[in-house]
Regions:
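Transmembrane helix-bundle signature of multi-pass secondary active exporters and lipid flippases
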Residues: 31-39, 228-247, 276, 306-313
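Interhelical loop/hinge segments that connect adjacent transmembrane helices in multipass membrane
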Residues: 127-132, 154-161, 167-209, 380-382
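Interfacial transmembrane-helix starts/ends
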Residues: 28, 58-72, 192, 257-271, ...
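Hydrophobic alpha-helical transmembrane segments
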Residues: 97-104, 130-178, 353-377
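Signature of the first transmembrane helix
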Residues: 1-42, 82, 196-219
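Membrane-interface junctions at transmembrane-helix termini in multi-pass inner-membrane proteins
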Residues: 51, 109-131, 255, 308-335
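Interfacial segments at transmembrane-helix termini and the short loops linking adjacent helices
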Residues: 21, 87-103, 222, 282-314
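Helix-loop junctions and terminal segments of transmembrane helices
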Residues: 41-57, 231-258, 325
């Protein structure tokens, strides 16, 4: 997963350096739509991985049920996002309806990838999971970068991203058919219910973690939204890098009867975050090089705030996965309250670049603290 995140980060650098701030701001908002739309894939991944982890004797049947669901969910998500172009295009100040349609096209293979990842994760097939994640990162950096090199526009970048999104599906193609010949059967109802609950929580989280890119595109002028997007490169790096912890420890969190696994995981993610913030604060000019160079020089003194916001969101991400592993779906209420708080501050107080990133950092830190100290919910039967 680290390799995937490095590749995705590399694409962000290529895009920041190749596109003018106006175009890069639009691309960042579109990538935010993909991340939010990808919650169905993550919900399917979490539900599949958890079911296999707690019911290993029913692995064959669970994989069969997942396979039957995947194409339906993929087609539904892709179509819904594509149709949303009529609302999102004017909201994000885009010049064409096609970029959002291409977001929908990208989400079809990404949803299939989610099912494949859940099977690999639940069965501890780490090599297969690594191949899938690397395929996602390589597909993004090669497809997106090649498209930008041919024609440096948002439309071109999204075409490359949509094509590259099929590479991880090819890498994990055998997983969905792994046990399709087994005659055992498990009802899809329980899997669907768990996937919906997981998707709801992940939707709330990804709205929280991506809403600032959409707010910046909607509220700021196109130049300032591009500046904010450059800072988000660093925020996403701080957010995505430690996510391998959530993936690796999720089966342990699902089976654990104590909080030791949770404590170890949170400590590790928080430690990565502190290193990221310290490094950015001490070496801001080096960080500037990593987010696009001198044309974003106005952001130099504020980059550490983006590292802080991303690090806080990384801890929240882990705590969300911990809650899903424990079937503690009540966390979704706190996530939506956090979303409402950020939106209220952004639009009610009329914040600028600094105010928006500080709002994200503060709300995420408070949310992580509340979730950590909240009484643990009892596990539901699997």
């Amino acid at each position: 997963m680290v390799g995937m995140n490095i590749a995705v980060y590399a694409f962000s650098i290529v895009a920041a350096r190749s596109l003018i701030p106006r175009e890069f701001g639009a691309l960042t908002a579109l990538l935010g739509i993909i991340l939010v739309g990808n919650v169905a894939a993550l919900g399917l991944q979490v539900a599949t991985a958890r079911r296999i982890a707690v019911e290993p004797d029913r692995t064959n049947e669970i994989i069969g049920a997942t396979t039957r669901l995947t194409l339906l969910i993929a087609a539904s998500v892709g179509s819904a996002v594509a149709l949303a172009t009529f609302a999102l295009t004017p909201l994000l100040k885009l010049e064409s309806y096609w970029p959002v349609v291409l977001c929908g096209a990208t989400l079809v293979p990404l949803t299939v990838m989610g099912a494949q990842s859940g099977i690999a994760q639940g069965t501890a097939r780490w090599r297969s999971l690594t191949a899938i994640y690397l395929g996602n990162g390589i597909g993004r950096v090669i497809g997106g970068s090649a498209a930008i090199a041919i024609h440096p526009t948002v439309n071109s970048a999204m075409i490359g991203i949509a094509i590259g999104a099929w590479l991880p599906v090819l890498a994990g193609a055998r997983l969905l058919a792994l046990h399709s010949s087994v005659h055992g059967f498990v009802s899809r109802r329980g899997l669907v219910r768990e996937a919906i609950l997981g998707t709801h929580a992940l939707l709330a989280y990804f709205v929280l973690s991506n809403m600032d890119s959409l707010i910046a595109r909607n509220r700021f002028d196109v130049h300032d939204s591009g500046l904010y997007a450059s800072g988000l490169i660093l925020a996403k790096a701080a957010l995505f890098f430690p996510q391998f912890v959530s993936v690796v420890v999720f089966p342990d969190l699902a089976r654990a009867n104590s909080h030791h696994a949770r404590l170890r995981a949170v400590s590790l993610v928080a430690g990565f975050g502190m290193l990221a913030v310290a490094a950015t604060a001490i070496l801001p000019k080096v960080a500037l090089i990593l987010v696009g160079g001198n044309k974003y020089a106005d952001m130099t003194s504020r980059l550490w705030l983006f590292a802080l916001a991303g690090s806080a969101l990384a801890v929240v991400h882990l705590l969300v996965f911990d809650a899903l592993a424990r079937h503690a779906h009540g966390i979704v209420i706190l996530l939506w309250l956090a979303v409402a708080t950020v939106a209220g501050c952004a639009y009610g107080l009329g914040v600028g670049i600094t105010g928006l990133v500080v709002t994200i950092a503060a709300v995420s830190t408070i949310l992580a603290t509340i979730v950590w100290f909240a009484p643990a919910e009892s596990r539901s039967p699997s």
